[in-house]
Amino acid sequence: MSDILPLDVIGRRVEVNGEYATVRFCGAVPPVAGLWLGVEWDNPERGKHDGSHEGTMYFKCRHPTGGSFVRPNIVNFGEDFLTALKKRYVLTDGPDDDEKSCSLKVGSKQVQTIGFEHITKKQSQLRSLQDISLWKCAVSCAGERGRIAEACPNIRVVDLSKNLLSTWDEVILIAEQLKDLEALDLSENKLQFPSDSPTLTRTFSTLKTLVLNKTGITWTEVLHCAPSWPVLQELYLKSNGISISERPVNALQNLRLLDLSSNPSIDESQLCLIAYLPRLEHLLLSDIGLSSIHFPDAEIGCKTSMFPALTYLIVNDNQISEWSFINELDKLQSLQALSCARNPLTKGDKAEEIIIAKIGQLKTLNRCQILPEERRGAELDYRKAFGKEWRKAGGHPDPDRNRPSAEFLSAHPRYQLLCCKYGAPEDEELKTQQPFMLKNQLLTLKIKCSNQPEQQILEKQLPDSMTIQKVKGLLSRLLKVPVSELLLSYESSKMPGREIELENDLQPLQFYSVENGDCLLVRW
């Protein structure tokens, strides 16, 4: 804290008793004597007014209680980069030598920060530092030009999140001294970005990862700055209130990951503006209020030219409630992984199974690998579940008579393909099951592992409507054996010694006349 004010005090980021704010006013506030700073708090609940006092407006706040007047001597204006770096990383013989180290992420890269507990003699020398974290160190400026480059020229990864940086120009003054800079996290610095494209320099010529979460940047400002990031691969823009206002032309063309999560102004029409980034593989759209998406260039069963390289899509915590959303995702030519947790659509027990059936090339769902037998089961169940609807809409096992309606094909774009893959559902499969009656439909069966004589014979009660596929799934969990390796047959208590194979996974136990007291034989 100091009574000496910076020359450019208006717009400066400051910290007061652990709370962060931006200086909006400096001067007298009559009738109280002395110098005052008018600040707008990041947390509006911390303030008392909207920037006015006794009828006079001294500055404006976005929130009616976002402002306060404070004395300069209680305000922390921060310190330069190198001073903060030395405080954190230079080895000392003081009582706090055993400060903890911590693990953090800068973009998708895991970084082990160097606490005093892990510092070696070599690492204590600033020149040897490569990955650093100055999180919450009150860094506000670059300091004397050239000193950073001289003291620590080998830094590649920098976490400057939650500091007191005020402008993008100040960031440039730091970055231009780090010639090998690859990853930079500036999250939670309320930065003033240039309103026009800055002069192109080589400042960020090696930068691959840039994190700008909660910085207040707009999409227009992103595009103004982007030409200065020629090799950028990962860009994080979470929680900025961003609206995508224009298509990136000659900018962000090397981008592989884009995080737009928690920007509720983004909708499906805006996503079309970033749909032709040629190398975009990962797109993070969690918590933006998304409910629909549409790729108008692709008909049913065709692939879109939009998002050509997209392999991983995250749409957690949105408002997705219609299966048409999932149908559209099957049009993405490269999509292999999807995360869509905590959406209205995914609350049902069968939701994940239906998603697997609807998106043919999907290999990972909600961070879980989709095994071949799981896909087969999901597709067979889907084919059976909508078989009656398919028949009513004009579907037929005879190819010459198979003419399902356009409405059905729109709702179930992959159904015809599944019929080609597994065959059309048979009449027996589509019969309505009789109402469940516990007394005559619950079978008590013995389960014997034929090629594992040491295995104890089990006894289970199973519904006679349970399909062979579901029985295999149950046995797979009980015996810790993959479903694909299980072979099932049974011996009837009425015909000892005769073994009947259960070869059709889609048929229920009752189809094979399995009865109470019979024995299921399991091999693998």
From Swiss-Prot:
Gene3D superfamilies: CAP Gly-rich-like domain, Phosphatidylinositol 3-kinase Catalytic Subunit, Chain A, domain 1, Ribonuclease Inhibitor. The keyword Ribosomal protein does not apply. GO terms for molecular function: alpha-tubulin binding. Belongs to the TBCE family. Keywords: Acetylation, Chaperone, Cytoplasm, Cytoskeleton, Leucine-rich repeat, Phosphoprotein, Repeat. Tubulin-folding protein; involved in the second step of the tubulin folding pathway and in the regulation of tubulin heterodimer dissociation. Required for correct organization of microtubule cytoskeleton and mitotic splindle, and maintenance of the neuronal microtubule network. Supercomplex made of cofactors A to E. Cofactors A and D function by capturing and stabilizing tubulin in a quasi-native conformation. Cofactor E binds to the cofactor D-tubulin complex; interaction with cofactor C then causes the release of tubulin polypeptides that are committed to the native state. Cofactors B and E can form a heterodimer which binds to alpha-tubulin and enhances their ability to dissociate tubulin heterodimers. Interacts with TBCD. This is Tubulin-specific chaperone E. The modification Phosphoserine is found at residue 492. Coiled coil: none annotated. GO terms for biological process: adult locomotory behavior; axonogenesis; developmental growth; microtubule cytoskeleton organization; mitotic spindle organization; muscle atrophy; peripheral nervous system neuron axonogenesis; post-chaperonin tubulin folding pathway. The gene is Tbce. Residues 27-71 form the CAP-Gly domain. The modification N6-acetyllysine is found at residue 460. The lineage of its organism: Eukaryota, Metazoa, Chordata, Craniata, Vertebrata. Residues 343-381 form the LRRCT domain. It comes from Rattus norvegicus. The modification N-acetylserine is found at residue 2. GO terms for cellular component: cytoplasm; cytoskeleton. LRR repeats lie at residues 154-175, 180-201, 206-227, 231-253, 254-273, 279-300, 309-330. It is found in: Cytoplasm; Cytoplasm, Cytoskeleton. Disulfide bonds: none annotated. SMART domains: CAP_GLY.
